[in-house]
Design a protein with these regions (language model features):
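An alpha-helical appendage that flanks or caps ligand/catalytic pockets
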Residues: 1-4, 44-175
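Hydrophobic faces of well-ordered beta-strands that scaffold small-molecule active sites
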Residues: 13-16, 33-35, 65-72
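Short, acidic/polar
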Residues: 16-25, 167-175
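Glycine-enriched alpha-helix->loop->beta-strand junction motifs that scaffold or abut catalytic
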Residues: 25-34
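Short, acidic/turn-prone active-site loops that include or flank metal/cofactor-
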Residues: 38-41
Length: 176
């Protein structure tokens, strides 16, 4: 009666999904897809193929499905590299989120993106040892998620991990 809530207009539903079955459901049921799965064009296109299967199953037009990619970006200064302390501070928290996600979903270091396989293998061994006796491992694994890099994880925030898991580059390169 007072119209505090709009119940007449359709509200789009965005579905957050990073795993293949969930991405298919996002395409089937959602009006939009939200992911943090990848920072490469190829990876995003691969992930989109899973979403598209759900879109097709629902008989929808894929051009009407919005796509949202959560990531972090860090613009490199002139002559600045991926190993600078400023870059590690800004991009590191997101880079460790990628390691956390790989640890939970990929398990096999050989299945990780090629540039970070050696670092991920070390990270996996580190976390296997750290979490072996914890029932609530996910609290420890995801501590600092997107906010800060834990001291003990700083060794894994390498230029390769930053370059592979974040949108960190010179401004012109990010425009591409």
């Amino acid at each position: 009666e007072y119209e505090f809530i709009n119940t007449r207009d359709q509200i789009p539903i965005y579905v957050a999904a990073n795993a293949p079955k969930a991405m298919m459901l996002a395409g089937e049921l959602g009006d939009g897809w939200v992911t943090s799965r990848t920072n490469t064009v190829e990876g995003f296109q691969d992930a989109w193929q899973q979403v598209a299967k759900g879109v097709e199953k629902a008989g929808k037009d894929s051009s009407g499905l919005d796509r949202v990619l959560f990531s972090t970006a860090c613009l490199l200064g002139p002559n600045e590299g991926l190993d600078s302390e400023r870059v590690k501070t800004q991009a590191g928290p997101w880079a460790t989120v990628a390691l956390h996600s790989l640890y939970e979903t990929v398990k096999d270091p050989d299945a990780a993106p090629a540039p970070i396989r050696p670092t991920f293998a070390k990270y996996k061994a580190f976390m296997d040892q750290r979490l072996q006796s914890k029932d609530d491992y996910y609290f420890d694994l995801h501590d600092g998620h997107c906010l800060y890099v834990r001291d003990e994880e700083a060794q894994f925030v390498t230029p390769e991990v930053i370059g592979t898991t974040t949108m960190t580059a010179q401004p012109d390169a990010l425009l591409e």
